[in-house]
């Protein structure tokens, strides 16, 4: 499950050509789901993109969940909506979601997700032996494949080792075929890259490697080949990461390097969008961040 597989990956040299909207349209239309429902699914999926990381208002969460449940009622084959419901139940509500897990595993077009979803579910309810059984089944069926490399991430407890594994997966995700095989759209992959990069930036900063922290962001995010649509999907994450890196950059003592970095940081899509919005409303950034 994409939102449950929060593994957070990607390299700056990736070529993006498979958006979340395209994925939803392609997969749901193949299943014969009505276009009106597909359009509703695209809309709500976009609306809840930040709910796991940033939304804590129970009223807002409840409203989004009710919208999802209403869409699912129209066609139970809508595995995208089942997945989104599972994500909210698991991350925000803590309620048992086995009913929706059954629907998801019944209709997802990605065979490995049926096993992976059960692995995550049984781990979450404390049935480790059963969860491990699903992991072994995945290992047997998908050994030496990109799918297995992604799943391995969830069995690595040590952060440094997990980052190494994620980097390995990033290289695999350079392939458009691999992205489609594992069902990861551009927006999700970029989101993973942002989180991966945040972990690296934090690590270098805590180790006193200020210049390296900034260069990591520049290499992974500034130089990424990402469409404006992908940027917008991840706007909040990008904004927060950029603001943090801008502050870190100010601690660099080499003035020339600091200014060079600043120019690169301010050339990004998100930086330009912030400047445009701030020019219209001086309080834009405070208002935007307070909406979290």
What are the roles of these predicted feature ranges?
Residues 92-93, 125, 159, 207:
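Structural motif corresponding to the intra-repeat A-B loop/turn of tetratricopeptide repeats
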Residues 206-256:
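Intrinsically disordered, low-complexity segments enriched in Gly and acidic/Ser/Thr residues
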Residues 17-83:
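N-terminal leader/linker segments that initiate helical-solenoid repeat arrays
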Residues 257-292:
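Terminal, low-structured helical/coil segments at or just beyond the last alpha-helical repeat
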Residues 36-48, 61, 75-84, 107-117, ...:
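Generic helix N-cap/helix-start motif at coil->alpha-helix transitions
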Residues 49-53, 88, 121, 155-156, ...:
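Residue-level signature for tetratricopeptide repeat
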Residues 62-72, 96-107, 129-140, 162-178, ...:
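Alpha-helical repeat scaffolds
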Residues 1-20:
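Classical Sec-dependent N-terminal signal peptides that target proteins to the secretory pathway
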